[in-house]
C-alpha cells in the first residue's frame, strides 16, 4: 500500500456536494429522512457539450421520494447553483443534472497536479485491504509462449493498479508441478539426457515435449549423473529428472517474465500441498466433510455437454450446488488420487489462511467453465468471508502485416514470449496487450506495433511524453531558469499564471488531467487496467491536438518569445500532461521516454 495519496479528486468533491444538497433537501422534508445516497454518481457527461459533469441523483432518488425525477432534479439543481464551484446547472432529459464548473476549478486542478507530482492520482480507495493477484501460473513444462503473454501483462498491470489505488497487493504464481504433465516433462528430459550422452535419439516420440529448450536440461542431468541415471529404475530416476526439469523450466520462465518487467512475490508449489507429513488437500476435504459439504454419492448422467471428470460410479463429491454451481464436483479419481479441483480448493484455502479475503485469479479463455466451481469452493472453505474475482483473458492472434505468424523452431509448436519481446520490445507488448479489454480477442500485429503513427497507440502515448520534454528543452530560451529535474521543474512552475489558460484546447487538456484520479479509482474497483491505457490515449490525443493548434495558430504556441508569463503557464500545463502520462505508463509497466529514437 502506498504511503501517501492525493486529496479527494474533483469528481469526489462534487459527489460530496451533491450528497450535501440531498441531505439539505431531506432536512427540509423534500426528501425522506435517511434516504440512501449510495447509488448517486457524478461522472463526465457522454456529450462534452452538456457540461463538465453530470449526476443521476434525481433519477435514483425519485422513486423513494415519491416524486417525478425531473421535478426533483429542479430542486437539486436550484441548490447546486449556489455552489461556489458551479458556473451553470441544467436539467436534461428525464431528470439528469448537467454541471458546468467555474474556470478557477481547472486552474486549481492543474496546481494540484503540479503539487502532487508522481503522487497525483494515488488513491486510498483500497484502504490497505490485502489482495492476492495470481497470474501466469503456466505449467513449468517449457518457455512462455505468446498465449501466456496477455495474462502475464494483465495480471501485472492489475497488481500495479491496485497498489496505486491503496491496496496491499501480493503477486503470486501457482506452480503446477504435481500433475501428469511434469512426469511427461521428466521423461522428455531423460530422452535429452541420452542425447547429451551421445545416443542418437531420432525423432521425438509422440507424447513427449519436442522443443530444443529441453536440451540444456538433458545436458545438466548428463553432467551431474553421467550414465548412472539411465541405469536407474523409473521410480528412482523420475523424481530426479522431474525436480531438475521443473527447476530449470521455472528459471527459464522467470527470465521470460523479467524480459517483460514482470515479477511475483510468491511462487506457490502445488506439490507443497501434499509434501511431507501434512496433506493439505486431505485436510481440506476433511474440513468440508465436517461441514456437510463433502459426501459419497453418484452423479446423474450429464445432459447435453459432458461434465468434466464425470464417472458413473460412487465417488467423493463436493456439494458445489449448495454454493451456486450447476453440479456437485468429484474430489477423488477412481485410482484414489486427487482431482485437480481438489488441489485447487486446498490452494485457495491457503490464500484465505494467509489473510487474503480478496482474491483475483487471471485465467485463460479455456478456463471459463471452471469459475463457478472454484467460487463455490471458496464460499465453502471461507464461510462466505472470502471473495474470488476471475478475470478471463482471451486469445491473442499473432500477425505480421495482417498474416498469421509461423511457429517457433526452438519451442517446437508455438511462438515464444521472448521472441515477441526481442522483436518489438517490452513496451509495445505491454501497452498493446492492455489496449483492449481482457475478455475480447486481441489481434497483435508485429509490424503495426512499431509504426510511428497515431494508429499505433503505444507510440502515440510515449510520443506525447517525449514531445512534452522537447517543449521544455526549447523553452529555456524564453524561461532560462526552467529546471531540468522533474520535481524541481514542477515546483518552479507552481506559481505560473495558469488562469490565463482559457483556449478551448487548453481547457480540454485541463479537464482530461482532472479526470485521472477518477479513472484510477474506477479502474481499480472494476479490476480493469485497460481503462488506464484508454485514458492515456485520450490524454495524449488532447495534448497532441493542443500542440497542433499552436502550430496552426502562433499565438497559441507553448512558447511565446515576448510573453514569459503565458509561456510559463503553458509550460505548467505541459508539465501536468507529462507527469500524468508518466504516472499512467508506470502503472502499466511501460517506460515514459524523454526522447523518441
From Swiss-Prot:
Key words, A-Z: Aminoacyl-tRNA synthetase, ATP-binding, Cytoplasm, Ligase, Nucleotide-binding, Protein biosynthesis
Coiled coil: none
Family: Belongs to the class-I aminoacyl-tRNA synthetase family.
Keyword Lipid metabolism found: no
GO cellular component: cytoplasm
Name of the encoding gene: argS
UniProt keyword Hydrolase, yes or no: no
Compartments it resides in: Cytoplasm
Protein name: Arginine--tRNA ligase
GO biological process: arginyl-tRNA aminoacylation
Predominant place of localization: cytoplasm
First-tier enzyme category under EC: ligase
NCBIfam families for this protein: argS
InterPro entries tied to this protein: aa-tRNA-synth_I_CS (IPR001412), Arg-tRNA-ligase (IPR001278), Arg-tRNA-synth_N (IPR005148), Arg-tRNA-synth_N_sf (IPR036695), ArgRS_core (IPR035684), DALR_anticod-bd (IPR008909), Rossmann-like_a/b/a_fold (IPR014729), tRNAsynth_Ia_anticodon-bd (IPR009080)
Matches recorded under Gene3D superfamilies: Arginyl tRNA synthetase N-terminal domain (3.30.1360.70), HUPs (3.40.50.620), Isoleucyl-tRNA Synthetase, Domain 1 (1.10.730.10)
UniProt catalytic activity: tRNA(Arg) + L-arginine + ATP = L-arginyl-tRNA(Arg) + AMP + diphosphate
EC annotation from Swiss-Prot or TrEMBL: 6.1.1.19
Taxonomic superkingdom: Bacteria
Molecular function via GO: arginine-tRNA ligase activity; ATP binding
Signal sequence annotation: none
Motif position, 'HIGH' region: 138-148
Amino acid at each position: 500500500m502506498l504511503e501517501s495519496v492525493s486529496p479527494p479528486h474533483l469528481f469526489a468533491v462534487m459527489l460530496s456536494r451533491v450528497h450535501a444538497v440531498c441531505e439539505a433537501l431531506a432536512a427540509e422534508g423534500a426528501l425522506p429522512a435517511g434516504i440512501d445516497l449510495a447509488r448517486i454518481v457524478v461522472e463526465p457527461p457522454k456529450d462534452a457539450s452538456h457540461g463538465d459533469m453530470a449526476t443521476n441523483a434525481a433519477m435514483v432518488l425519485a422513486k423513494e421520494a415519491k416524486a417525478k425525477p425531473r421535478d426533483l432534479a429542479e430542486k437539486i439543481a436550484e441548490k447546486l447553483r449556489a455552489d461556489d464551484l458551479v458556473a451553470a446547472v441544467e436539467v436534461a432529459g428525464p431528470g439528469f443534472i448537467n454541471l458546468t464548473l467555474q474556470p478557477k476549478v481547472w486552474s486549481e486542478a492543474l496546481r494540484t497536479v503540479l503539487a502532487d507530482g508522481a503522487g497525483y492520482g494515488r488513491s486510498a480507495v483500497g484502504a490497505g485491504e490485502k489482495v492476492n493477484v495470481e497470474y501466469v501460473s503456466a505449467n513449468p513444462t517449457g518457455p512462455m509462449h505468446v498465449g501466456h503473454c496477455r495474462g502475464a501483462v494483465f495480471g501485472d498491470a492489475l497488481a500495479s493498479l491496485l497498489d496505486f489505488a491503496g491496496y496491499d497487493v501480493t503477486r503470486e504464481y501457482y506452480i503446477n508441478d504435481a500433475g501428469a504433465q511434469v512426469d511427461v516433462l521428466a521423461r522428455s528430459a531423460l530422452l535429452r539426457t541420452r542425447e547429451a550422452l551421445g545416443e542418437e535419439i531420432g525423432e521425438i516420440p509422440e507424447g513427449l515435449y519436442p522443443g530444443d529448450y529441453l536440451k540444456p536440461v538433458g545436458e545438466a542431468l548428463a553432467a551431474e549423473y553421467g550414465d548412472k541415471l539411465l541405469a536407474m529404475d523409473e521410480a528412482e530416476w523420475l523424481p530426479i529428472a522431474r525436480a531438475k526439469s521443473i527447476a530449470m523450466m521455472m528459471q527459464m520462465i522467470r527470465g521470460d517474465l523479467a524480459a517483460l518487467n514482470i515479477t511475483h512475490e510468491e511462487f506457490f508449489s502445488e506439490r507443497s500441498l501434499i509434501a511431507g507429513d501434512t496433506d493439505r488437500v486431505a485436510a481440506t476435504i476433511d474440513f468440508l466433510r465436517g461441514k456437510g459439504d463433502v459426501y459419497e454419492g453418484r452423479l446423474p448422467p450429464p445432459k447435453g455437454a459432458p461434465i468434466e471428470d464425470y464417472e458413473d460410479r460412487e465417488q467423493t463429491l463436493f456439494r458445489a450446488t449448495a454454493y451456486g454451481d450447476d453440479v456437485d464436483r468429484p474430489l477423488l479419481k477412481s485410482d484414489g488420487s486427487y482431482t485437480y479441483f481438489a488441489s485447487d480448493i486446498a490452494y485457495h484455502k491457503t490464500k484465505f489462511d494467509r489473510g487474503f479475503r480478496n482474491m483475483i485469479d487471471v485465467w485463460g479463455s479455456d478456463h471459463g467453465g471452471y469459475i463457478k466451481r472454484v467460487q463455490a469452493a471458496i464460499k465453502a472453505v471461507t464461510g462466505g468471508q472470502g471473495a474470488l474475482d476471475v478475470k478471463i483473458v482471451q486469445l491473442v492472434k499473432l500477425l505480421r502485416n495482417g498474416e498469421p505468424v509461423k511457429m517457433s523452431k526452438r519451442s517446437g509448436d508455438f511462438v515464444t514470449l521472448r521472441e515477441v519481446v526481442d522483436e518489438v520490445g517490452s513496451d509495445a507488448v505491454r501497452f498493446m496487450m492492455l489496449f483492449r479489454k481482457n475478455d475480447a480477442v486481441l489481434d497483435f500485429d508485429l509490424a503495426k506495433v512499431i509504426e510511428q503513427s497515431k494508429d499505433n497507440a503505444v507510440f502515440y502515448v510515449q510520443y506525447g511524453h517525449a514531445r512534452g520534454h522537447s517543449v521544455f528543452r526549447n523553452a529555456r530560451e524564453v524561461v532560462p531558469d526552467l529546471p531540468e529535474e522533474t520535481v524541481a521543474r514542477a515546483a518552479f512552475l507552481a506559481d505560473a499564471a495558469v488562469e490565463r489558460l482559457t483556449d478551448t484546447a487548453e481547457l480540454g487538456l485541463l479537464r482530461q488531467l482532472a479526470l485521472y484520479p477518477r479513472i484510477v479509482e474506477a479502474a481499480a474497483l472494476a479490476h480493469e487496467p485497460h481503462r488506464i491505457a484508454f485514458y492515456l490515449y485520450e490524454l495524449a490525443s488532447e495534448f497532441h491536438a493542443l500542440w497542433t493548434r499552436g502550430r496552426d495558430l502562433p499565438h497559441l504556441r507553448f512558447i511565446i518569445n515576448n510573453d514569459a508569463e503565458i509561456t510559463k503557464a503553458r509550460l505548467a500545463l505541459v508539465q501536468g500532461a507529462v507527469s500524468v502520462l508518466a504516472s499512467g505508463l508506470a502503472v502499466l509497466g511501460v517506460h515514459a521516454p524523454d526522447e523518441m529514437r
